[in-house]
A protein has these predicted regions:
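Local sequence-structure signature of Cys/Sec-based thiol-disulfide redox active-site neighborhoods
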Residues: 1-23, 29-31
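Thiol-based oxidoreductase modules, predominantly thioredoxin-like and allied folds used
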Residues: 27-38, 45
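Structural micro-motif
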Residues: 45-52
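Non-catalytic, surface beta->alpha helical segment in thiol-disulfide oxidoreductase systems
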Residues: 55-75
Length: 75
């Protein structure tokens, strides 16, 4: 299942998000950096990090736990 972690440079919450993805067994995901993209910054600026399921566009906003990620992936 294709996943994207939406993040920005110098995001102090992104490292813990990576840890929760690892705890959920998620090893493969793309990163989308919002820096410098006005539309993405407007949409995600205060929400990051956000995990997006590419197949249906569903999004899981931070904070999330490993268990929340597993439930999100289960659909």
């Amino acid at each position: 299942m294709p996943l994207t972690l939406i993040q920005r440079d110098d995001c102090h919450l992104c490292d813990p998000a990576w840890e929760q993805l690892a705890a959920a067994g998620v090893a493969d995901f793309e990163s989308l950096w919002i820096d410098g993209d006005a539309a993405l910054e407007a949409r995600y600026g205060v929400r990051i990090p956000v995990l997006r399921r590419e197949e249906d566009g569903a999004e899981l906003d931070w904070p999330f736990s490993g268990e929340a990620v597993r439930q999100f992936l289960a659909g």
